[in-house]
Amino acid sequence: MPRIIGFIFAVFLGWSAPVWAQGSLNLYCSATIEWCQPIARGFERETGIRVTLAQKSTGEMLAQLRAEARNPRGDVWWGGTGDPHVAAGEEGLTQAYESPRIAELHEWAQAQWRQTEGRTVGVYASVLGFGFNTELLTRKNLPAPACWTDLLRPEYRGEIQMANPNSSGTAYIVIATLVQMMGEDPAFEFLRRLHGSINAYPRSGTAPITAVARGETALSISFVHNAAEERAAGFPVGHAVPCEGTGYEIGSMSIIKGARNMAAAQRFYHWALSAEAQLTASQEAKKLQTMANRRVPLTDGAPNMATARIIDYDNARFGASAERRRLLARWDREVGALPR
């Protein structure tokens, strides 16, 4: 059940919407709750529009949009990996919108907007890689991984977590990245071999790096900004970008087709693309992604996408609903069904 943050709960969060608040917005959010809340608060402060917030992982939110297609309850979907947003647009669950602020964005954010004919836009980006607990590695005399192939080393057996790709956009990007780098059959052979080293497939994409920070597992396949955030919070966490190259996420935003509060949805969309909104919310949430607006500087300690070896990720192909369903079904048959 999603956590809901609405106007009536404002007193518990230490803030309140202006007494002149007009209108409302139902915000679906697939970032972490620690980031969703500042986004909701910031928009209420700026506009006086009352926000009701529902938070779920990207895959779970896509499933909810499909279930609500005939009677949409949300207005805007913010955050989470871009592939499910692309799939939602392809399925007619979201609708096109053009903000004058599109021109202020990095090319990768604009490219996603163009590719989907305006149905989704990038709001942040991050690189896929590994997180690891430095204290656990030392205690167990394990090396830090540097490459994808390192994950198959026998000493890592039972030491790695990766999210479940059926619910996690992060884990789906792992599959899509490996398919693009290795070819589909070799990628699935890699995933089958990796399965023996996986100790859990949690539903959330951030759960593996949280487990690393808590010392519950030695390694995770995660976005490197999440590892950097855990380190900044004082946990013994390091990260690495795979030496062979890697994929990346474009955290996205979409207006839900048939939104009941369309004017508020469009106003939120325009506001959320501003440098001020992105800087304030990311700082409050202590997030280290690269933000879409070019005027937002890279935060100290944030991984720099410009220095990573990033593949030419095919968002059109791997965001397509049919391709997504096919790859997930293959993962279920050939990997998820295997004993551990």
Q: Where are the regions that the model predicts?
A:
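A ligand-binding cleft/hinge motif common to bilobed small-molecule-binding domains
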Residues: 83-87, 213, 218-236
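Mature extracytoplasmic/periplasmic domains
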Residues: 256-315
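A bilobed periplasmic-binding-protein/Venus flytrap-type ligand-binding module shared by bacterial periplasmic
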Residues: 131-136, 176, 249-262, 280-283
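Periplasmic-binding protein-like
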Residues: 126, 189-195, 199-202, 233-257, ...
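Extracytoplasmic ligand-binding site segments that recognize negatively charged/polar headgroups
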Residues: 30-34, 73-216
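Conserved C-terminal helix/tail region of periplasmic/extracytoplasmic solute-binding proteins
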Residues: 313-340
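Short beta-strand->loop
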Residues: 95-104, 120, 149, 235-247, ...
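Early extracytoplasmic/lumenal segment of secretory-pathway proteins
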Residues: 22-87
